[in-house]
């Protein structure tokens, strides 16, 4: 009898252990997974806190992410969660029932939504008022610069209060004195045109684009004089901005703050070796110093997920203070705002220690890159198309601007 009891007890223990060891694997779609360190920090932090759930990242190409993610969602792909790159995409996904509303989950957990500085509102559907994603990153644009090239040129580092005209003069001076590129513009529309929205008044969807002329002229002047790489060269080579700056022959590069984590990683693994810093992006006269543009990056749960409870557990952790601290260790700015998170950001290994770089973490204002509204997707397509024609010199700047306004007028309500 004792032997039988021992056998039954052993079987029971095995069954209990097997149940305890049962794991749920969540597939989470994002972009630039292998070059963005915070994905690893999120995975490791969450799995340590939740050993019964494993995270498997699904890496989609950055330039194709919106199209690929939308195709996967509409096709019923079993990927559980999707990072949200564009606010307009989430609006479409929610209208089509492709992602799960989170309001009931938020209420059931008593989840604190007060720590996002209002950025969570970007993920509320205009159609039904439901919350369809939570923000985990709060990206805004800064100026990255190579201190070594500035030192070589004998030029003072950028400050957090400088104008676009001052930036232009500095780019030319450093290029002239070092033979390096004074600045670098990636091929995105935002790298050239979005500075016009930093005043918080203009938008790229308002149908008025005269304010873009200054920035196109600025860029083309740089390109003509070899101060930056040409648009055609970059498009033909497919060079990624992260690798371009890491080569060490570019003095400045306006880019989203997310690049800080990549650059810190490059310094650690030897891909890059320069001393670097960040400053606030330049401003136009009459616009507050430290003004920038940006948008949150969020996480949404697929309606096709078979693991919605586990998916919510991951999303809510990723966007919480614990998740924010994990993200901040890589030099990335989380969406969750607290003193604890700020302390982690400032102490991230590899982050510049100078006061200008620290000050650049606190922008005066962040304008939304694209507003949310009817017709915005169509206008975005138009602006990008005409932007490409201007950048490739197929049309004159004023001709392209006029075409933007004429074509966008059809969608202005």
Residue spans for each PLM region:
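A structural signal for short loop-to-beta-strand junctions that line the ligand-binding cleft
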Residues: 72, 79-80, 109-149, 181-182, ...
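Hinge/lid segment of periplasmic solute-binding proteins
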Residues: 86-140, 273-280, 347-351, 359
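Short, well-ordered beta-strand elements
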Residues: 23-33, 53-58, 80-81, 132, ...
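Extracytoplasmic "Venus flytrap"/periplasmic binding protein-like
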Residues: 45-115, 152-154, 244, 249-252, ...
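Long, aromatic- and glycine/proline-rich binding clefts that accommodate carbohydrate-like moieties
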Residues: 279, 329-382, 389
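Extracytoplasmic/periplasmic substrate-recognition and gating elements
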Residues: 48, 54, 129, 153, ...
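Glycine-centered hinge/linker elements that transmit conformational signals in sensory
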Residues: 171, 204-235, 281
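Short, polar/charged alpha-helical segment
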Residues: 33-54, 382-383, 401
């Amino acid at each position: 009898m004792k032997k039988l009891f021992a056998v039954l007890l052993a079987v029971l223990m095995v069954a209990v252990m097997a149940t305890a060891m049962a794991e749920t694997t969540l597939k989470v779609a994002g972009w630039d997974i292998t070059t963005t360190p915070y994905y690893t920090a999120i995975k490791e932090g969450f799995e340590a806190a939740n050993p019964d759930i494993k995270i498997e990242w699904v890496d989609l190409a950055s330039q194709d992410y919106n199209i690929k993610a939308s195709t996967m969602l509409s096709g019923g792909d079993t990927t559980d969660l999707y990072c949200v790159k564009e606010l307009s995409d989430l609006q479409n996904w929610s209208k089509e029932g492709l992602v799960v509303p989170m309001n009931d989950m938020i209420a059931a957990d008593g989840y604190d939504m007060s720590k996002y500085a209002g950025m969570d509102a970007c993920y509320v559907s205009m159609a039904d008022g439901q919350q369809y994603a939570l923000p985990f990153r709060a990206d805004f644009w800064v100026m990255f610069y190579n201190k070594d090239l500035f030192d070589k040129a004998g030029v003072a580092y950028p400050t957090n209060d400088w104008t676009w005209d001052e930036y232009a003069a500095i780019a030319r001076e450093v290029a002239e004195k070092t033979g390096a590129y004074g600045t670098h513009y990636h091929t995105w529309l935002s790298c050239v045109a979005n500075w016009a929205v930093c005043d918080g008044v203009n938008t790229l969807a308002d149908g008025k684009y005269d304010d873009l002329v200054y920035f196109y002229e600025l860029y083309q002047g740089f390109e003509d004089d070899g101060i930056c790489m040409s648009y055609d060269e970059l498009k033909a080579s497919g060079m990624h901005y992260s690798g371009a700056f890491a080569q060490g022959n570019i003095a400045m590069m306006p880019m989203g703050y997310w690049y800080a984590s990549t650059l810190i990683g490059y310094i650690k693994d030897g891909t890059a070796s320069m001393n670097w810093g960040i400053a606030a992006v330049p401003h136009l006269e009459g616009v507050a110093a430290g003004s920038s543009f940006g948008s949150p990056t969020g996480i949404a749960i697929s309606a096709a997920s078979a693991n919605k409870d586990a998916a919510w557990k991951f999303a809510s952790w990723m966007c919480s203070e614990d998740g924010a601290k994990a993200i901040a260790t890589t030099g990335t700015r989380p969406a969750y705002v607290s003193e604890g998170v700020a302390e982690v950001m400032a102490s991230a290994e590899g982050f510049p220690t100078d006061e200008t770089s620290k000050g650049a973490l606190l922008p005066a204002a962040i304008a939304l890159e694209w507003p949310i509204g009817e017709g915005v997707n169509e206008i975005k397509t138009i602006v990008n198309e005409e932007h490409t024609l201007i950048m490739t010199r197929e049309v004159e700047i004023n001709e392209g601007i006029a075409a933007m306004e004429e074509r966008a007028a059809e969608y202005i309500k």
